[in-house]
């Protein structure tokens, strides 16, 4: 008996071709995925470090993670964890960087790179709140979340307090000064927010808080002028005169003393962001950063 040849329908043929393609692709991906498997730890570290030096942060992070997964312990692994956190920071993955740093600090609390990791955590926390989010977060300047920059300040303070002789202490102090002035500017903008809404008691409260918490900041005399303005409207002549006397002695050219329209409220777009710009509400001039003691 003669057997008839078997013919595949177009649908069956397409299914066979598709299955073959998936099998080949899967094998290729598996080969690519496992390309670093079995590579000596020093070679894997060199590969990741080279990628990082070239600015390939994503590739470096992937290679460092593979090294850490394949070799959980050892000096190369410890250094890979440090550089992986840096690669994440440079990639803008600040939350991931902070998580990696926290894991390292918990695992190796006495490691010689601990000062650097606190410093890097400060840099990462400083950048967690993006400018875009600051602008669209809320119109109410008094309800912003300063937890990330405050944590950054604490990280830099840890470097300065615990490791004053480390190579990162000098810049940590500079970063603290910049953050401190930013916090003072935030308080000044909140004060202006209340002045603009004729909330005189609230404005005086925030101005006093600024002066007590951030003395000698670039915004101290604007805060004194805000006190004078608020107390004038509240009918407290004694306190208003005290504010005027302080300005006459220390900032005689302040616009509030000259009867000029003060304060000059930020433009509409800057009302969204208490950190926007570095200009004094009094003069419109850019303020210089002052050293904190």
Curated annotation (Swiss-Prot):
Q: Which residues form the signal peptide?
A: 1-26
Q: How does it sit in the membrane?
A: Lipid-anchor
Query: What InterPro entries does the annotation carry?
Result: BamD, BamD-like, TPR-like_helical_dom_sf
Among Pfam families, the record links this protein to: YfiO
Q: Where in the cell is it found?
A: Cell outer membrane
Name the source's superkingdom: Bacteria
Q: Residues with N-palmitoyl cysteine lipidation?
A: 27
What UniProt keywords apply to this chain's record, in alphabetical order? Cell outer membrane, Lipoprotein, Membrane, Palmitate, Signal
GO terms in the biological process aspect are: Gram-negative-bacterium-type cell outer membrane assembly; protein insertion into membrane
> What PROSITE patterns does the record point to?
PROKAR_LIPOPROTEIN
* Protein role: Part of the outer membrane protein assembly complex, which is involved in assembly and insertion of beta-barrel proteins into the outer membrane.
Per the record, the similarity remark reads: Belongs to the BamD family.
In its UniProt entry, what is this protein called?
Answer: Outer membrane protein assembly factor BamD
């Amino acid at each position: 008996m003669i057997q008839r040849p078997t013919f595949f329908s177009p649908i069956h043929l397409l299914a066979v071709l598709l299955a073959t393609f998936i099998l080949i692709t899967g094998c290729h991906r598996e080969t690519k995925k496992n390309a670093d498997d079995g590579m000596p730890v020093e070679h894997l570290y060199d590969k990741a470090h080279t990628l990082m030096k070239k600015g390939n942060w994503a590739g470096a992070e992937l290679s460092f993670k593979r090294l850490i997964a394949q070799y959980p312990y050892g000096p190369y692994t410890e250094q890979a964890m440090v550089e992986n956190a840096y690669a994440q920071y440079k990639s803008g993955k600040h939350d991931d960087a902070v998580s990696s740093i926290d894991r390292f600090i918990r695992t190796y609390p006495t490691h010689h790179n601990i000062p650097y990791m606190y410093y890097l955590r400060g840099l990462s926390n400083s950048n967690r709140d993006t400018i875009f989010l600051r602008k669209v977060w809320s119109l109410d300047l008094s309800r912003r979340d300063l937890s990330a920059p405050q944590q950054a300040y604490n990280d830099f303070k840890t470097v300065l307090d615990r490791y004053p002789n480390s190579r990162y202490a000098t810049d940590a102090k500079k970063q603290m000064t910049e953050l401190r002035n930013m916090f003072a500017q935030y308080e000044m903008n909140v004060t202006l927010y209340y002045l603009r809404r004729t909330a005189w008691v609230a404005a005086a409260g925030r101005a006093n808080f600024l002066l007590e918490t951030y003395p000698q900041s670039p915004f101290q005399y604007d805060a004194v002028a805000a006190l004078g303005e608020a107390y004038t409207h509240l009918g407290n002549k004694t306190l208003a005169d005290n504010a005027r006397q302080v300005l006459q002695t220390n900032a005689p050219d302040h616009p509030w003393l000259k009867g000029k329209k003060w304060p000059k409220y930020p433009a509409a777009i800057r009302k969204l962001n208490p950190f926007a710009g570095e200009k004094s509400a009094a003069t419109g001039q850019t303020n210089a950063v002052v050293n904190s003691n």
